[in-house]
Design a protein with these regions (language model features):
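Paired acidic/hydrophobic, glycine-rich loop segments that form the ligand-binding mouth/hinge
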Residues: 29-35, 143-147, 163-165, 254-255
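An extracytoplasmic/periplasmic, membrane-proximal ligand-sensing/linker region
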Residues: 117, 183, 205-266
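A ligand-binding cleft/hinge motif common to bilobed small-molecule-binding domains
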Residues: 39-49, 115-117, 144-178
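Active-site-proximal beta-strand/loop segments in catalytic clefts of secreted hydrolases
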Residues: 9-11, 35-36, 101, 127-128, ...
Length: 266
């Protein structure tokens, strides 16, 4: 494009701040939201009074990658696999506290689902960002945490972290040694997350088409695809219609997961 691309991070409130910003953007502008399911699915299910409507206030553009979080612990934790972790957690008098990047996030839901399925006392501690949770875990304030695969791989390479299991439908190519929850016998962990782009509502078709075309070309670039894989996401190019269809398919599945996990917005 002939215009500079400016990335403006807006962390906090489980993505609500960032998503709401787009609803106040001029529909003719080139400001879009790069997000994950939490802003449009998880928040919509858990919070009845969102400042935005996840469908009416946005224009779907494209999904560019799919993946999921993994359960991690300090390298010196007294367990080396998920079964040992569960046994340790059940024996802990006060339970184990874990950190995620927000209430209602996929990591939070999977943590609550694991708690339900194992009977272990797992206590959720939400943070504004993944790194803050990991810092507290390394400092001893948390017993374990969830991590995006790219973060986990870097910390594992540095000898600071061990990964016990990953969500999603298959093992990750960047960490093939880490088993999925599904293959370990747990149900409900096979929902893939995604990275998607949304524009504001009523975005002109020409602007929408320009964005979709650009995202399609960029995602197909070998270096971009490799970067997505390094982050633990499988590259994917979807049309706006396919994105909307994926949303309609994932919403009820996530609602059921939230119900099974007993997760609430705290």
């Amino acid at each position: 494009w002939s215009q500079a691309i400016v990335v403006e991070p807006k962390p906090g409130a489980s993505g609500i701040i960032a998503a709401d910003t787009i609803t106040h953007t001029n529909k003719d502008s080139y400001t879009v939201l790069m997000t994950m399911p939490i802003t449009h699915i998880n928040n919509a299910i858990l919070q009845p009074k969102l400042p935005y409507d996840p469908v009416k206030d946005f224009t779907p553009l494209s999904i560019v990658g799919t993946g999921g979080p993994m359960l991690v612990a300090r390298a010196d934790a007294p367990y080396n696999n998920l079964q040992e972790f569960i046994e340790y957690a059940k024996k802990s008098p006060k339970g184990l506290t874990y950190g995620t990047w927000g209430n209602g996030s996929a990591a939070h839901l999977f943590g609550e689902l694991l708690k339900r399925q194992t009977g272990a006392n797992l206590i959720h501690a939400p943070y504004k960002a993944e790194a803050a949770a990991h810092n507290d875990m390394f400092g001893g304030a948390l017993d374990f945490a969830w991590a995006n695969p790219s973060t986990a791989r870097a910390l594992m390479a540095g000898g600071k972290l061990k990964a016990l299991a990953v969500s999603g439908t298959r093992r990750l190519s960047i960490l093939p040694q880490v088993p999925t929850f599904t293959e370990l016998g747990f149900k409900g962990f096979d929902i893939d997350s995604w990275i998607g782009f949304y524009g504001p509502a009523q975005m002109p078709p020409a602007v929408q088409e320009a964005w979709v075309s650009a995202l399609t070309k960029i995602t197909a670039m070998p270096d971009v695809a490799a970067r997505l894989v390094s982050y633990g996401f499988e590259p994917l190019v979807s049309t706006p219609a396919q994105f909307a269809e994926r949303y309609q398919r994932d919403y009820p599945r996530t609602a059921q997961l939230i119900k099974e996990a007993g997760a609430t917005f705290q």
